[in-house]
């Protein structure tokens, strides 16, 4: 019985070339893993008109939902609920302002069709997912504020992290600066943010410990402030766009929230129109 010849053995020169190629590929992969993330471009300044438009849009949306004003925790006598089919295009516009809608549009198109057909399932229109962050994102986008300066998102925590990161990297030009909720008196255009979790953070600096993980939050847009009160408009508040009148002291500083209410953790100072070459100082 004769032995069958095996496959030809690679030459030493070929083996060396293969080893060198493998080593080069490994170094390339390691280099790619170690490459630093690109530094984002600095944010651009905006004219005062951007903040003014932001406030006009927030106020107009609030009026379209019935112009309801409540104190924290209070329920209004009447409100135009999100489940009213007449409000379908309003909330749809908010969701169209975020890059990922979490399936909200597809789900609620089906519920809208059910409501039009008299199907009881239509009563759940716009109940899920929560749309408060989409509302804030819509106001910013409609005011002409680009995603670089305000990256709208379906989750408040995502854009909160982006604003905190911008303030750390570009403190001189960041359009929004995080402040402690009781360190400053809020002004129109600022964002007032609260933690809705069971173990809430009490200061925006504590957010770093989450390392980007989702945290239930809610942010409102301050539209009026003065001695004794801070008025802020938010979406998905009592199933509508609602204006909440938060108590403040004689100097306009927020008073601590009542027990059981979401915990304030930040006021994001709005610097649109307040950075060079613009120097507007009025509200």
Feature locations, PLM:
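...with weaker cross-activation on analogous glycine-rich loops/strands in unrelated enzymes
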Residues: 152-238
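Bacterial N-terminal signal peptides that target proteins for export
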Residues: 2-22
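Short loop/turn segments at secondary-structure transitions that flank enzyme active sites
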Residues: 64, 139-142, 146, 198-200, ...
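C-terminal motif of bacterial Sec signal peptides marking the signal peptidase cleavage site
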Residues: 30-32
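Low-complexity, Gly/Ser/Thr/Pro-rich intrinsically disordered linker/tail segments
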Residues: 231, 236-283
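N-terminal capping segments
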Residues: 37-150
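Residue-level signal for mature regions of secreted extracellular proteins and peptides
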Residues: 26-27
């Amino acid at each position: 019985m004769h032995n069958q010849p095996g496959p030809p053995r690679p030459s030493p020169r070929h083996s060396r070339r293969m080893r060198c190629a493998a080593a080069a590929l490994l170094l390339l992969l390691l280099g790619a893993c170690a490459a630093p993330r690109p530094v984002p471009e600095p944010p651009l300044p905006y004219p005062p008109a951007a903040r003014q438009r932001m406030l006009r849009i927030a106020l107009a949306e609030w009026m379209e939902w019935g112009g309801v004003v409540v104190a924290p925790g209070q329920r209004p006598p009447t409100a135009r609920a999100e489940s009213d089919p007449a409000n379908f295009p309003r909330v749809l516009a908010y969701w169209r302002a975020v890059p990922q809608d979490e399936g909200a549009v597809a789900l609620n198109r089906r519920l809208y069709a059910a409501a039009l057909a008299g199907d009881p399932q239509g009563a759940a229109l716009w109940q899920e997912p929560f749309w408060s962050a989409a509302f804030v994102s819509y106001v910013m986008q409609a005011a002409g504020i680009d995603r670089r300066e305000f990256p709208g998102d379906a989750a408040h925590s995502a854009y909160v992290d982006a604003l905190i990161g911008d303030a750390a990297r570009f403190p001189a030009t960041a359009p929004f600066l995080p402040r402690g909720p009781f360190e400053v008196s809020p002004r129109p255009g600022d964002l007032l943010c609260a933690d809705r979790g069971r173990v809430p953070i009490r200061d925006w600096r504590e957010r770093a410990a989450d390392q980007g993980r989702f945290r239930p939050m809610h942010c409102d847009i301050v539209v009026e402030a003065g001695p004794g009160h801070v008025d802020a408009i938010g979406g998905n508040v009592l199933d509508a766009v609602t204006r909440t009148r938060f108590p403040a002291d004689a100097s306009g500083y927020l008073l601590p929230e009542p027990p059981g209410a979401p915990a304030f953790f930040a006021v994001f100072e709005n610097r649109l129109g307040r950075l060079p070459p613009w120097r507007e100082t009025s509200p």
